Amino acid sequence: MRKMTKLAGLVLAASMLASTAYAAEKQAAFDFEKDDCGFIPIYVDYPGGEGVDEFYELRYGHETVPIDGAGKGLFLSGNNHSDDLFMGCYKELAGFRPGQLYAFHVTFRLATQVDGGMIGVGGSPGASVYVKGGIAMEKPERVQDGLGYYRLNLDKGNQGQGGTDLTLLGNLEKEETVRPGEYEWKEFSFDARTRADAEGRLWLALGTDSGFEAVSSYYLDDILLSWAETADEIITRGEAVRRLYDDLRPAEEDTPNFTDVEESSPYWKALGWAQKSKLASGYGDGVFGPEDPLTVEQAAVILYRYAGSPAVKRDGVSIEASDWAEEAIIWGIGNGLISEEDGADGGKPIDEFSFTRAWGKVRAAQAHLCQSLYKQHP
């Protein structure tokens, strides 16, 4: 974008992002006029192997956007032979206060040539190519599963479902077609709450998750960020269970038999499902305590049970935890869901961000397992 607003004119280089003196709110922008601003491409959800990248026609570059007066942007393109291709890019943001929780607002523009109402192989070239974005406390990386497919180490959801690290923002379809078949701008925005890592780093990630089985191409430009420090928030036991219920959308329903949960409660359906699934059993006296703060031990047990209560290798690990939570705590530490420090003080409340992040990791691991099983037995 060459017609910059006052905010967009505050184009800050990485050195500005590395500043440690924060006001109430900071801002940064990337317009890609001179270079790619340090963004790195990443492609996942396709098999590894010699010549595969060429077969999938994966392309990434700092190129001129084919819109009058647009200047340059980031070009991404790929052929979705796997019916599940994610293609995107990310950038490290440095200089934040280690361990501090931040609230971000991000806007960007995407140039797409896909007109509305189109149909295609496997899905629509517009409505079935989902745009996602997020800010994570871990560097986006691709890892290979047991079948050799590249997967993202972050929770991005799958196609039309968002994740805890990358949320669903929309799709590639033009909102209004002015020039049929030509590239036109589409605006996106999202909010994110993310904690900086031990070195004061965060990662911005943007991309598309495709259900259209052919070539998709687009340009990213004018990425604007604003952020401010924010306080941790405690998550309650009822809200934690409802978070899982809302994300999973289970078909089965049941009636909870907790004496302190009425049918009018916003947690009624979620607790019925959680009790039937044996994810949450209450305090053992018929009381659940939906408004009580969720503790680290309780969070670990819920996630451990959802993961199927896998066998735990103690390997001489000694953790001071409640008997009912010991295996879950060891499992949580071993899988990077909770820190050893938090595990040693499992009776304290867990904050909302830490629980959401841990849940995202567990859900992503389960999703990758399901994808691998489907590839084996479609």
Model regions: which residues?
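Extracellular carbohydrate-recognition regions
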Residues: A24-E54
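Short, surface-exposed tryptophan/glycine-enriched loops
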Residues: G146-R201
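Sec-dependent signal peptide cleavage junction
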Residues: L17-E25
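Short beta-strand-plus-loop segments that form exposed binding edges in beta-rich domains
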Residues: L172-E176, A205-A214
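Extracellular carbohydrate recognition
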Residues: P180-E187, R195-D197, S210-W227, K348-P349
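Short beta-strands within extracellular/lumenal beta-sheet-rich domains
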Residues: N80-R97, W185-D191, L220
